Amino acid sequence: MGSRFLILIFAFISLCYSQNEINIKNLAIIENIYFVKDSKKPFSGSAFSFSKLTREKILEFQIIDGKKNGIYSEWYINGKKKSKYNYQNNLKHGRYTTYYQNGKKKEKGFWKHGKNEGLCTYWFENGQRKKEGIYKSTKGVGLWSYWYPNGNIEREGYRNNGIKNGFWVYFYDIGVKKSKGNYFDDFKYGLWTFWYTNGNKQSEGYYKKDKKNSLWTNWYANKQKREVGLYIDNKEDGEWIYMSENGEKILSGYFNKGKKVKTWSHWYSGSRKKKQIEYNEGIIISELCWDKIGEIISCL
C-alpha cells in the first residue's frame, strides 16, 4: 500500500509539476510549509540547491502543497550520491539509503511516518558492516549485531523497546569471545563470564542490576586462580583469598562493605608468613612482619 502511494505521488509530480522548479533559496518555510518568498500560496514542484564551490547540484526534493512528498536526494560536492529518502507529508516514509563520499553505503533501512521501522543496516567506510538490527517506532527490538571494521563480530544480543534485554555476547577484534551474560532493562543480571584474548577464563560471577552480588572468581591468563571473594552491591565483603600465578596463596583477609577489616595475612612462597596486618574500617591498627627464614623484622 505504501509503495503504491509513493508511485502515485511520483507520477502526479511528473505530470503536474515537472516544469515547476525553484532554487531552495527562493523558498520560505512557515510552520513547516514551503512558500515561494512573498507568496501566500504553498509551493508545489521541485526544489533544488547547488554547491557554491563547484556549482554541482547537492540537493533536490519534491514538494506538494508546501510539504515534502516523494524522493529527497542529496549529493556530495564531488558529485557522488549522499542520500536518498522518500517523504510523505513532510515525514520520512519508505526505503532510504545514505552513502559515504567514497561511494560506499553508509546506512540502509526504512522509515514509517517519520520513525525508523524494520531492518536497518549500517556500514563502515571500508564497506564492512557496522551494525544491523530491527527498529519498531525508532526503538531497537529483537536481535542486534555489531562488527569491528575488520569484519569480525564485536557484540550481539537482544533489545526490547530500544534497550538491552536478554542474552548478549561480546568478542575481541581477533574473533575470540570476550564476555557473555544477560541484561534486564539495560542492566547486567545473573551469571556473567569474561575471557582473556587467549581464550582462557578471566572472571565469573553474578550481577544484580549492574552490580556484582555473589562469590566472584578471577583467574590469571594461565588458568590459575587469582582471587576469590564475595561482592555485595559491588563492594567486597567477607573473606577474600589471593593466589600467585603458580597457585600458591599469597594474601587473605576480610572486607566489610569494601573496606579492609580484621586480620590480613601475606605469605612468601612455600606458605611462609610474610606480614600480618590488623584493620579497622580500612585503617591499619597494627602490623607484624617476618623475613624469609621466619624471623620477626621491622615493617617498612
Q: Which residues fall in each region the model found?
A:
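N-terminal secretory signal peptides that target proteins for export/translocation
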Residues: 1-2
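Sec-dependent N-terminal signal peptides
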Residues: 5-14
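Glycine/tyrosine- and acidic-biased, solvent-exposed loop/turn segments at the edges of beta-strands
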Residues: 15-300
